[in-house]
């Protein structure tokens, strides 16, 4: 019998009983499918060429709030409270310090909600809790605060290229702000997007992106808006396959079996390593489903266009949250993290890593743990992740250049690093799935903390080279587009100082994880 536990509507309880899935998960999927249809309608009948930005903002906001109340009931008021108070802080605190005040309040409010949900209501229950959307709203609030701070307080020469490209030069109106944080396309599962990208989409400027010509220069083509139909269809196919895999295979390979006493006592090391990998592999399709569906919804509305490739084919991956092929074929810890929950990784980079004055890696992992929630397993995963990241970086910097030639040696190196990466990632994230301290330590004990020990030895024995903070190619493409939009809004390229002083950095989210599809 499917559970009837939900804070939202029980209208779909008969469907929940029929498919034997919890009502909160049914509500989430049905609302996302409704959002998909609404997105098609929004792009067709409320296109920026047919209606004003005001109407598009209002409709996107009202639909988003309706979906939120349907899924979460009165708990959805937290979305408005958190967003509303943060907006007031932006106005009152001023552009000099608003980013710090908004960061502390938004993250603190999220943490309080997570603590009450976990330790007062349903510890260990992966329901479609209201803190999931709040995680995305928190990303948007803090991103916008830093972006306004960068655009209205700091001098251009003080900004990095990424910060300069995403800087917001004027204070958003209340409607623009609420539309950005609570629109129907991203209210339930994200992903995070930058404020400038969202406003460009609403105002109809996002599709006017220059296409690279044969001589390498950008040319503005006078073609109609690119159609997202092919991209949406492809992503819906991925959603269907991911959901099918999750409903059929995932339950046959539970992560908890890694700490089964009989399995630990009888399984050989190759068997343990193999099952560890396949059980964590089977745990990923639920994320593939949720994030890819969220991406498809945004694309169906016309949001997510990132220009054309060299063949003139439209790309709809501006706010994509993952790259499945790169994840499954990752040959380094960094490669895996760069392609998993992409928008959240960008948020962490922009609000923490690039701004940290010391130990940026440690601070970033700590912020990630706080943002994800209060389960002890999260912190154990991210503490382990810091160790694994530093060790993997040291190994790569010291040895990779020896294996680049000939191609056969490079292939051998890639195979070995693929195996090492997949086992290390699986080993690291087991506590994230198990949640609690005791089962997590039971797992690590059964492995004799071997990867922890190896990582410590690597850091002690190998010289550690400091890595430079770089901007990715995708980010550079996005920033060049953002710069064009910014110049269009502010032709003189000057910082405008408003009486509503505020501050904001750059952030593109990511989505974040949606609890309804987490074990």
Swiss-Prot record:
Partially inhibited by thimerosal. One of its GO terms (cellular component) is endoplasmic reticulum membrane. It is found in: Endoplasmic reticulum membrane. Induction: Increased during chondrogenic differentiation. GO terms for biological process: phosphatidylcholine acyl-chain remodeling; phosphatidylethanolamine acyl-chain remodeling; phosphatidylserine acyl-chain remodeling; phospholipid biosynthetic process; regulation of chondrocyte differentiation. The keyword Lipid biosynthesis applies. Residues 497-519 are annotated as: Disordered. The chain crosses the membrane at residues 22-42, 61-81, 88-108, 184-204, 236-256, 263-283, 365-385, 415-435, 443-463. Pathway: Lipid metabolism; phospholipid metabolism. Highly expressed in epididymis, brain, testis, and ovary. The active site is at 341, 372. Its EC number is 2.3.1.-, 2.3.1.23, 2.3.1.n7. Keywords: Acyltransferase, Endoplasmic reticulum, Lipid biosynthesis, Lipid metabolism, Membrane, Phospholipid biosynthesis, Phospholipid metabolism, Transferase, Transmembrane, Transmembrane helix. One of its GO terms (molecular function) is 1-acylglycerophosphocholine O-acyltransferase activity. It comes from the Eukaryota. It is a multi-pass membrane protein. InterPro entries: LPLAT_7/PORCN-like, MBOAT_fam. Signal peptide: none annotated. It catalyses: a 1-acyl-sn-glycero-3-phosphocholine + an acyl-CoA = a 1,2-diacyl-sn-glycero-3-phosphocholine + CoA; a 1-acyl-sn-glycero-3-phosphoethanolamine + an acyl-CoA = a 1,2-diacyl-sn-glycero-3-phosphoethanolamine + CoA; a 1-O-(1Z-alkenyl)-sn-glycero-3-phosphocholine + (9Z)-octadecenoyl-CoA = 1-O-(1Z)-alkenyl-2-(9Z)-octadecenoyl-sn-glycero-3-phosphocholine + CoA; a 1-O-(1Z-alkenyl)-sn-glycero-3-phosphoethanolamine + (9Z)-octadecenoyl-CoA = 1-O-(1Z)-alkenyl-2-(9Z)-octadecenoyl-sn-glycero-3-phosphoethanolamine + CoA. Belongs to the membrane-bound acyltransferase family. Acyltransferase which catalyzes the transfer of an acyl group from an acyl-CoA to a lysophospholipid leading to the production of a phospholipid and participates in the reacylation step of the phospholipid remodeling pathway also known as the Lands cycle. Catalyzes the acylation of lysophosphatidylcholine (1-acyl-sn-glycero-3-phosphocholine or LPC) and to a lesser extend lysophosphatidylethanolamine (1-acyl-sn-glycero-3-phosphoethanolamine or LPE). Does not acylates lysophosphatidic acid (LPA) and lysophosphatidylserine. Prefers oleoyl-CoA as the acyl donor. This is Membrane-bound glycerophospholipid O-acyltransferase 2. It comes from Mus musculus (Mouse). The lineage of its organism: Eukaryota, Metazoa, Chordata, Craniata, Vertebrata. The gene is Mboat2.
């Amino acid at each position: 019998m499917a559970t009837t536990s939900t804070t939202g509507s029980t209208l779909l309880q008969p469907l929940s009983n029929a498919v034997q899935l919890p009502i909160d998960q049914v509500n989430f999927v049905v609302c996302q499918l409704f959002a998909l249809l609404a997105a098609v309608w929004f792009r067709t009948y409320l296109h920026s060429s047919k209606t004003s930005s005001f109407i598009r903002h209002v409709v996107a906001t009202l639909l988003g709030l309706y979906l939120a109340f349907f899924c979460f009931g009165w708990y959805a008021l937290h979305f408005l409270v958190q967003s509303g108070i943060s907006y007031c802080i932006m106005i009152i605190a001023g552009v000099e310090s608003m980013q710090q005040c908004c960061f502390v309040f938004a993250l603190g409010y999220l943490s309080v909600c997570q603590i009450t949900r976990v330790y007062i209501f349903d510890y260990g229950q992966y329901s479609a809790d209201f803190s999931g959307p709040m995680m995305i709203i928190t990303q948007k609030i803090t991103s916008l605060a830093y972006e306004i701070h960068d655009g209205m307080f700091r001098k251009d020469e003080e900004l990095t290229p990424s910060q300069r490209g995403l800087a917001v030069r004027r204070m958003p109106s209340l409607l623009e702000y609420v539309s950005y944080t609570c629109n129907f396309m991203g209210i339930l599962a994200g992903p995070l997007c930058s404020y400038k990208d969202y406003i460009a989409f609403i105002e109809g400027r996002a599709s006017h992106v220059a296409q690279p010509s044969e001589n390498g220069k950008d040319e503005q083509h006078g073609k109609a808006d690119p159609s997202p139909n092919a991209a949406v269809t492809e992503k819906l196919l991925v959603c269907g396959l991911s959901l099918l895999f999750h409903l059929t295979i995932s339950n046959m390979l539970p992560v908890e079996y890694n700490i089964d006493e009989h399995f630990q006592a009888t399984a050989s090391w190759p068997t343990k390593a193999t099952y560890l990998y396949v059980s964590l592999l089977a745990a990923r399709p639920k994320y593939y489903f949720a994030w890819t569906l969220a991406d498809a919804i945004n694309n169906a509305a016309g949001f997510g266009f990132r220009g054309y490739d060299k063949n003139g084919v439209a790309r709809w991956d501006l706010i994509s949250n993952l790259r499945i092929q790169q994840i499954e074929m990752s040959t380094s810890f960094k490669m895996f993290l760069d392609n998993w929950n992409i928008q959240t990784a960008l948020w962490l980079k922009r609000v923490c890593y690039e701004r940290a004055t010391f130990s940026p890696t440690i601070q970033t992992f700590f912020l990630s743990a706080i943002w994800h929630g209060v389960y002890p397993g999260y912190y154990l995963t991210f503490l382990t992740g810091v160790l694994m990241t530093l060790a993997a970086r040291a190994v790569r910097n010291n040895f990779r250049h020896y294996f680049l030639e000939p191609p056969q040696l490079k292939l051998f190196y890639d195979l070995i690093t693929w195996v090492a990466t997949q086992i290390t990632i699986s080993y690291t994230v087991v506590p994230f799935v198990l949640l609690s301290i005791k089962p997590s330590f039971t797992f690590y004990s059964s492995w004799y903390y071997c990867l922890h020990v190896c990582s410590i030895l690597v850091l002690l024995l190998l010289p550690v080279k400091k890595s430079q903070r770089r901007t990715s190619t995708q980010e550079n493409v996005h920033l060049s587009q953002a710069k064009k939009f910014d110049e269009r809004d502010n032709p003189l390229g000057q910082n405008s100082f408003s009486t509503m002083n505020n501050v904001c950095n750059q952030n593109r989210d990511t989505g974040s994880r949606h609890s309804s599809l987490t074990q």
